[in-house]
């Protein structure tokens, strides 16, 4: 008959557990005093700071017997406080991997905003199999495993050698070789890569480190994202086609808006102080330019017109877009350029002229941030639609025009640059591998992005899986929400919403 544990014995076990010592825990009775030779020490982040080893043991034990748990604590505090992360070692490698598959980026613990981060500790990476495993390509199909071993054994001890075979059992002309150390694998790469061309092969032998699971997952996500972005771009060009069909209606509205008799209708519009008659006329000209560019896609004339270059080039002038003393008369006089552009429907617009459409960025702030009165809501709604179509066209045609410079400026500024009210987005459920460049490329088709940032956990240096994107106008932000909210990447669906205003929390 087994005697119950005394209170002193139970208290001693709790102390051993809380100190993070290698105390053999429940479920470990079938194991020796030490974990298996290939056991993995795992780092676990995003755990509540209030949790001790006892709560963590209950979390991990369903996946296998736990050998050791060590909570990282800040020793500068008295008593030492948890840093919200720990190390855990299971008795078996299988248990550690099962726990990682079930918890990493999946389970969110009580009181935490982000899911658990679980990965092999840095000390385990020094000799991980993925760091010692080589891929051998352009191998003669006449070779077997023994031939490959003989070829690579001079570089060190080989733990595993396997030729990749098809369903028919025949070699596919490639193999995997795992050495005992990474240094051996590196020596094999230096000596063997492209050193010879084997029988029946068209190229020299390829020797490189095998792709890791993370590499494969990242490549799969990139391919999936590329396909989905292609679909988005196709939809964007479809919107442009629709714009071309309705252009005469929009041009009529824009011309009417720029006439001297109608300028008074805009007096009641909020935030229109910086948008003068010439800017509205420029917007009308851009609509005509978009129509000409759309028509030119099917034209057989390959010679760009110099008149188109001069007309579109004028649109990019910051003076034309920002002159505060422009008059209605000057705006009406400049409508001659609009007539010129309308006459180009059957002509080809050269690439330089399409590049000139980037000048639309100067118009982004005024129209998108406008509040409307009842009298002008219908007209401005049509203007907004026309402007949105032109904007999406320019972003689709010139996806790399400003992405690199934007990231450089953002990095130099060191902080998140925000757009006007209603133009700032909060994006949840981003893939772990996404960085600033990825999120920027994803949201560029909807307008002029002035800032794109993925947030990184300073302790783990891993993505927090959320970020911000700011446009220079609310129209683009709403277009991005409509297209990207619920957009699936891998196993995740993006959640895209407007960033809450700073004034929302104020009672007045």
Curated annotation (Swiss-Prot):
Compartments (UniProt record): Nucleus; Cytoplasm
GO BP: mRNA splice site recognition; regulation of alternative mRNA splicing, via spliceosome; regulation of heart contraction; RNA processing
Coiled coil start-end: none
Keyword Transferase applies: no
Outcome, altering residue 493 to G: In DEE97; uncertain significance; mislocalized to the cytoplasm
Homology family: Belongs to the CELF/BRUNOL family.
Disease: Developmental and epileptic encephalopathy 97: A form of epileptic encephalopathy, a heterogeneous group of early-onset epilepsies characterized by refractory seizures, neurodevelopmental impairment, and poor prognosis. Development is normal prior to seizure onset, after which cognitive and motor delays become apparent. DEE97 is an autosomal dominant form.
Function: RNA-binding protein implicated in the regulation of several post-transcriptional events. Involved in pre-mRNA alternative splicing, mRNA translation and stability. Mediates exon inclusion and/or exclusion in pre-mRNA that are subject to tissue-specific and developmentally regulated alternative splicing. Specifically activates exon 5 inclusion of TNNT2 in embryonic, but not adult, skeletal muscle. Activates TNNT2 exon 5 inclusion by antagonizing the repressive effect of PTB.
Record's protein name: CUGBP Elav-like family member 2
Source lineage: Eukaryota, Metazoa, Chordata, Craniata, Vertebrata
């Amino acid at each position: 008959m087994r005697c119950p544990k005394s209170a002193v014995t139970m208290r001693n076990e709790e102390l051993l557990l809380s100190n993070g010592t290698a105390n053999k825990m429940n479920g470990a009775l079938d194991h020796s005093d030490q974990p298996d030779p290939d056991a993995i020490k795992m780092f676990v982040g995003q755990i509540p700071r209030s949790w001790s080893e006892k709560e963590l043991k209950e979390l991990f034990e369903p996946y296998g017997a736990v050998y050791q748990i060590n909570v990282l604590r800040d020793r500068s505090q008295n008593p030492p406080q948890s840093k919200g992360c720990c190390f855990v070692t299971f008795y078996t490698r299988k248990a550690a991997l099962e726990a990682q598959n079930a918890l990493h980026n999946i389970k969110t613990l009580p009181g935490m905003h982000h899911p658990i981060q679980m990965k092999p500790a840095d000390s385990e990476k020094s000799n991980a199999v993925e760091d010692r495993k080589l891929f051998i390509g352009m191998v003669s199909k006449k070779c077997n495993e023994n031939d490959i071993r003989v070829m690579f054994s001079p570089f060190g001890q080989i733990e595993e050698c396997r030729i990749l075979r098809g369903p028919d059992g025949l070699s596919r002309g490639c193999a995997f070789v795992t050495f005992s150390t990474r240094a051996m694998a590196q020596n094999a790469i230096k000596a063997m890569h492209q050193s010879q061309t084997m029988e029946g092969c068209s190229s020299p032998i390829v020797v490189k480190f095998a792709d890791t699971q993370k590499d494969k997952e990242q490549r799969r996500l990139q391919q999936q994202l590329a396909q989905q972005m292609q679909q988005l771009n196709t939809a964007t060009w479809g919107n442009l086609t629709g714009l071309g069909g309705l252009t005469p209606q929009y041009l009529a509205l824009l011309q009417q808006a720029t006439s001297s008799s109608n300028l008074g209708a805009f007096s009641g519009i909020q935030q229109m102080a910086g948008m003068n008659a010439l800017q509205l006329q420029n917007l009308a000209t851009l609509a005509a330019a978009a129509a000409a560019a759309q028509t030119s896609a099917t034209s057989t004339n390959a010679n760009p017109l110099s008149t188109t270059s001069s007309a579109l080039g004028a649109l990019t002038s910051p003076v034309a877009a920002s002159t505060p003393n422009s008059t209605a008369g000057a705006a009406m006089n400049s409508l001659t350029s609009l007539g010129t552009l309308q006459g180009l429907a059957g002509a080809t617009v050269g690439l330089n002229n399409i590049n000139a459409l980037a000048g639309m960025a100067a118009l982004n702030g005024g129209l998108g941030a406008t509040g409307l009165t009842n009298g002008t809501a219908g007209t401005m709604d049509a203007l907004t639609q026309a402007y949105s179509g032109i904007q999406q066209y320019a972003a689709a045609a010139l996806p790399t025009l400003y992405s690199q410079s934007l990231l450089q400026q953002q990095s130099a500024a060191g902080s998140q640059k925000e757009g006007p009210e209603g133009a700032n987005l909060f994006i949840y459920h981003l893939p772990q591998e996404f960085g600033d460049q990825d999120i920027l490329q994803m949201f560029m088709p909807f307008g002029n992005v002035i800032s794109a940032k993925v947030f990184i956990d300073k302790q783990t240096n891993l993505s927090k899986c959320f970020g911000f994107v700011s446009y220079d106008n609310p129209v683009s932000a709403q277009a991005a929400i409509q297209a990207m909210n619920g957009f699936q990447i891998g196993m995740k669906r993006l959640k895209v919403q407007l960033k809450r205003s700073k004034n929302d929390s104020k009672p007045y």
